């Protein structure tokens, strides 16, 4: 994956509140997991437009790549963008995916289609396989 962490600021232009938390998370990820292709914080237009991002912020670690994974700063902004994309018909839903819990858990939306449920079931099965392998180690 090529991951962008989005915010309302770009690469430290606002150094307080949620942009600062995103910026600090990126710093930790770059230090501890340098193999992960991730950068931010950045506004959505810079995340989605690699030419604009590369021209404006040539130091970015996503240079020349198209983002295929977006991490939002909070549930409210993530859910709003997710619902907007679904209503506009520009994305297929896979999720929501809960992470960081001791056991896999997944929720379906009241408006989920059969395809949405099949996709989420696939994620749940993969979660179970990964967890089983971890438990055997």
Which stretches of residues belong to each language-model region?
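Internal helix-turn-beta structural module
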Residues: 60-62, 77, 82-137
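Catalytic cores of large soluble enzymes that bind and process phosphate-bearing ligands
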Residues: 14-21, 73, 109-116
């Amino acid at each position: 994956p090529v991951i962008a962490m989005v915010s309302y600021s770009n690469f430290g232009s606002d150094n307080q509140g949620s942009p600062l938390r995103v910026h600090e998370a990126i710093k930790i990820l770059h230090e501890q997991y340098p193999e992960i292709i991730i950068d931010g914080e950045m506004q959505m237009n810079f995340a989605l437009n690699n030419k604009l991002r590369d021209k404006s912020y040539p130091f970015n670690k996503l240079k020349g790549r198209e983002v295929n994974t977006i991490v939002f700063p909070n549930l409210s902004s993530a859910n709003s963008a997710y619902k907007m994309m679904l209503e506009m018909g520009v994305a297929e839903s896979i999720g929501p995916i809960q992470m960081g819990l001791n056991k896999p858990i997944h929720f379906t939306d009241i408006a989920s289609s059969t395809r949405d449920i099949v996709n989420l079931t696939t994620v749940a099965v993969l979660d179970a396989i990964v967890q089983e392998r971890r438990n055997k180690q």
